[in-house]
Curated annotation (Swiss-Prot):
Keywords: ATP-binding, DNA-binding, Helicase, Hydrolase, Nucleotide-binding, Nucleus, Phosphoprotein. ATP binds at residues 262-269. It is found in: Nucleus. It comes from Schizosaccharomyces pombe (strain 972 / ATCC 24843). Its EC number is 3.6.4.-. The lineage of its organism: Eukaryota, Fungi, Dikarya, Ascomycota, Taphrinomycotina. One of its GO terms (cellular component) is nucleotide-excision repair factor 4 complex. It is an enzyme of class 3 (hydrolase). This is Uncharacterized ATP-dependent helicase C582.10c. A motif (DEAH box) lies at residues 384-387. Residues 249-433 form the Helicase ATP-binding domain. Residues 662-816 form the Helicase C-terminal domain. The modification Phosphoserine is found at residue 712. Belongs to the SNF2/RAD54 helicase family. It comes from the Eukaryota.
Length: 830
């Protein structure tokens, strides 16, 4: 024990000396010199208390990260971004140490003066309980001089996230070693986080911004034909391929891969197929040659078709009950395609205690015998529609992070939708050191944003994303195309967006007003009873009922469970309330998937959520029943109330009648239209009106199996009599190629504008020859107009983090309960 203590003490000394030398401090021969600062042990006989080291670990993290970022700043890394003025300068003069027992916590102004802009101090940091340093003001461009206030800083030990280790390795093949691999397997279970190796991690991350090393245009034109591909790449796809290959071959990096975040419709799938062909597995690598593609269910057949028709690669779909039989031959295929649901299912089976009450050890032994996707060490892992794992705590995110592989890629046109912390889940999956450690992300991104350092946070994010992410928008490519004189223009059709203001008829207006009044009364009861937070899910139900009333009054007569895509009833409804307080509005809307009104002990009105008397046997309260009776008086055909033409139904039929003759002879036939709605019940109502009008159509929603969905798409593409696709926004907004249509109707607005953009880009993409017409239906003076305001907040957030926004900053990353109240009454948000 004594020898071990000596060795540990010696190691700490060496680490401290090395750390000081990095800042120009000569430590030779100074071990026994005393200073006015906290001293190091004078000899090897003096032990270092383990508890002391452990207690100071957390306190020093801020200093180490500060020095690492400061060092990077001195090397003038070019991020191609405009300079952002930070709130406090960085010092180069020695710090003056002072302390007083009566010292109180600093106010906001003093803390801002003292803070290092590259390492904000957490409000919970232990630094407030110990001597602190007063930082003199100097120019940010001056070199940092010697530091004498950190002599006693000790290395900090942080645990590596479990998903980054080899704990889920079940394969029989040779496991890679630290010498012949790039990924996280082979590293110890704990890593020493000091300013030196943190700086090294950051150097590895920022030293190769391969966007600056893209080949010239002549090389791009020569390499547009990729051996093994049956099509020619466009210029921007060749440039993208150059970047993709560079990220997989970057030298001495602990992470190979990144985020391909091109706009929807620019060919991310084609670029990845080209990467698979142009950068195969080297023979010396200890992994299988296959690339694993994880995609939503609606896209797996499209991936298979793209791989097989546009390249010589072999592909197999890993899905269905008999999928385990494929594991014996899976290594023979170039591309293996599966879904997030399958991945979660197999991951959960590896993380349970087993069946029949087995112990964890027995269960682990049992699962080793059962093969799965986690038994392989993949050459490449691709997450299509990677924003699926935006919630770092979701099973999808945990399962994806548990996969073993060398090169890791995220494909998404919307890498950020609600708040900047969504990026952490992608960074964690990609193993981007040091930001894949949650404590580093919290200290460098989350806490500074909460403390008002928006400019600093967004500058850091843009610096990080400039290295690991390639993002090209359609507007940017069209603006830059052909500037070099090569004529390599990206030719996309125009996208014309029309906001259609729908006006209620008098009967509809009275119905909506009465409904809103009933719901405001229910909200008042929630507020007066002091149970507003506990009724979070009920509030969302009220909001969705109001949105349904904007579409068609009869939509409210459908039960929740009938609307598969909007409510998709699942088990576990009792847990929704405790989750609600920590979720964003977009995530809270997904909680409605667990709503089961009929399972509650108390009875509530299915329309306004008002509590019903114990002996009341109707599903609607008296006020809501009276409201429907008033509406029925204006319906011409009482036998079929769904054939009543609401304001939106009238606008939809009017838009479908606007087919005019195309001037371009190469484009013939009537326009085909995609009608998107979040409510399958509203699609059912549109279905009836299209049948009555004699308009040919097909369906694509969550109540259909995958084979039926593919059949609908084939009819839309090949049958001239099929003019309309009624599509669920949840099912059809991701990945589909619908260039056979040239018109989009968005029947209802959604909290998240990125979902709407994805839906539009199913039609407006490469291969579209017609101008795309987009009609967004919004009913005036209703909840829909307020939802549009919330959409604008989320757009600003995404623009700021991705570097293409205005100077104004989105200061609130969460939409709170007040935002929900605002949707009912503007005064509630004040």
């Amino acid at each position: 024990m004594e020898k071990a203590s000596k060795n540990k003490e010696s190691g700490v000394k060496k680490a401290n000396n090395s750390f000081l030398q990095n800042f120009g401090v000569n430590t030779a021969g100074k071990e026994n010199e005393s200073t006015s600062l906290p001293r190091l042990p004078k000899s090897e006989d003096e032990s270092i208390p383990k508890q002391s080291i452990k207690s100071k670990n957390k306190k020093k993290t801020q200093h180490f990260l500060s020095d690492a970022f400061e060092s990077l700043k001195r090397q003038e890394i070019d991020t191609n971004e405009k300079e952002v003025i930070v709130s406090a300068p960085i010092t180069s003069k020695p710090a003056q140490v002072f302390y007083s027992k009566k010292l109180e916590r600093k106010d906001e102004g003093i803390r801002k003066w003292e803070k290092d802009p590259f390492a904000p101090i957490s409000v919970k940091s232990g630094a407030w309980k110990k001597p602190y340093t007063k930082v003199p003001e100097v120019s940010i461009n001056k070199a940092t001089s010697k530091r004498t206030d950190l002599i006693n800083d000790k290395p900090i030990v942080i645990p590596i996230p479990r998903a980054s280790t080899s704990t889920l390795y079940f394969g029989k093949h040779n496991k890679p070693t630290s010498e012949n691999r790039k990924g996280p397997i082979g590293i110890p279970t704990e890593e020493i986080l000091t300013s030196q190796n943190t700086q090294a991690m950051l150097h590895k991350l920022f030293e190769n911004n391969v966007l600056d090393n893209v080949k010239d245009d002549s090389m791009q034109r020569q390499s547009s034909f990729i051996p093994g591909m049956h099509i020619r790449l466009l210029d921007h796809q060749v440039q993208g391929l150059t970047w993709l290959k560079s990220r997989e071959t970057v030298s001495k990096s602990s992470a190979s891969g990144g985020i391909l975040a091109d706009d929807m419709g620019l060919g991310k799938t084609i670029q990845m197929i080209a990467l698979i062909l142009s950068h195969p597995l080297p023979k010396k690598k200890h992994s299988i040659k296959s690339t694993l593609v994880v995609a939503p269910l609606s896209l797996i057949k499209q991936w298979e078709s793209e791989v097989q028709t546009k390249s010589k690669l072999t592909a197999i779909v890993y899905h269905g009950a008999s999928r385990y039989k494929l594991l014996k031959v899976i290594h023979e295929y170039d591309v293996v395609i599966t879904t997030y649901q399958i991945l979660v299912s197999e991951w959960v089976s590896h993380n349970t205690t087993g069946t029949d009450g087995k112990s964890p050890t027995e269960a682990k032994s049992y699962e080793k015998k059962k093969p799965s996707l986690f038994a392989f060490y993949w050459w490449r892992i691709i997450l299509d529609e990677a924003h699926t794992i935006k919630n770092k705590s979701s099973k999808s995110a945990l399962a994806c992070c548990a996969l073993q592989g060398i090169n890791r890629w995220c494909l998404t046109g919307t890498p950020l939708q609600n708040n900047v912390d969504e990026l952490y889940s992608l960074v964690k999956f990609l193993h981007i050191n040091p930001f894949n450690d949650q404590s580093v992300w919290k200290d460098q991104i989350s806490l500074p944003l909460c403390q008002g350092e928006e400019n600093l946070v967004f500058k850091r994010l843009r610096m990080l994303l400039s290295v690991i992410m390639l993002r090209r928008t359609k507007t940017l490519l069209e603006a830059n195309a052909g500037k070099d004189g090569t004529g390599g223009a990206l030719k996309l059709s125009k996208r014309l967006v029309y906001k259609v203001i729908c006006k209620f008829e008098e009967s509809e207006r009275d119905f909506y007003s009465n409904l809103a009044r009933n719901m405001e009364r229910t909200m008042s009861n929630f507020v007066n009873s002091g149970k507003l937070g506990k009724n979070y899910t009920n509030i969302l139900c009220l909001l969705l009922r109001l949105r349904q009333a904007c579409n068609h009054p009869q939509s409210l007569n459908f039960q929740f469970e009938q609307d598969v895509d909007a409510f998709n009833a699942l088990d576990g409804a009792a847990n929704t309330n405790k989750l609600a307080s920590d979720q964003d509005v977009d995530d809270l809307a997904n909680l409605l998937e667990t709503v089961e009104i009929g399972s509650r002990k108390k009875s509530f009105c299915t329309i306004c959520m008002a509590e019903l008397p114990p002996d009341f046997h109707e599903k609607k309260c008296k006020d809501c029943s009276r409201n429907f009776k008033e509406l029925d008086k204006g319906i011409q055909d009482p036998n079929d109330k769904t054939l009543y033409k609401s304001s939106k139904i009238r606008e939809i039929l009017k838009i479908l009648s606007l087919d005019e003759q195309e001037e371009d002879d190469t484009v013939r036939g009537l326009r085909k239209t995609i009608i998107f709605s979040q409510f399958t019940t509203f699609l059912d109502i549109i279905d009836l009106h299209l049948r009555k009008a004699g308009i040919g159509f097909v369906r694509y929603d969550g109540r259909m199996n995958n084979r039926a969905r593919e059949k609908s798409l084939d009819l839309l593409r090949s049958d001239s009599g099929t003019q309309v696709l009624l599509c669920s926004l949840k099912c059809g907004a991701l990945g589909l190629n619908l260039t056979c249509a040239s018109r989009v109707i968005l029947c209802d607005v959604w909290w998240n504008p990125a979902i709407e953009e994805q839906a539009i880009d199913r039609v407006h993409r490469i291969g579209q020859r017609r101008d795309v017409l987009v009609y967004k239906l919004v009913v005036e003076n209703t909840i829909e107009e307020k939802i549009v305001e919330l959409q604008n907040l989320k757009r600003d957030l995404a623009k700021q983090a991705l570097g293409d926004g205005k100077k104004s900053v989105f200061t609130s990353k969460k939409l709170t309960l007040n935002d929900l109240l605002f949707l009912f009454n503007k005064r509630a948000a004040a």
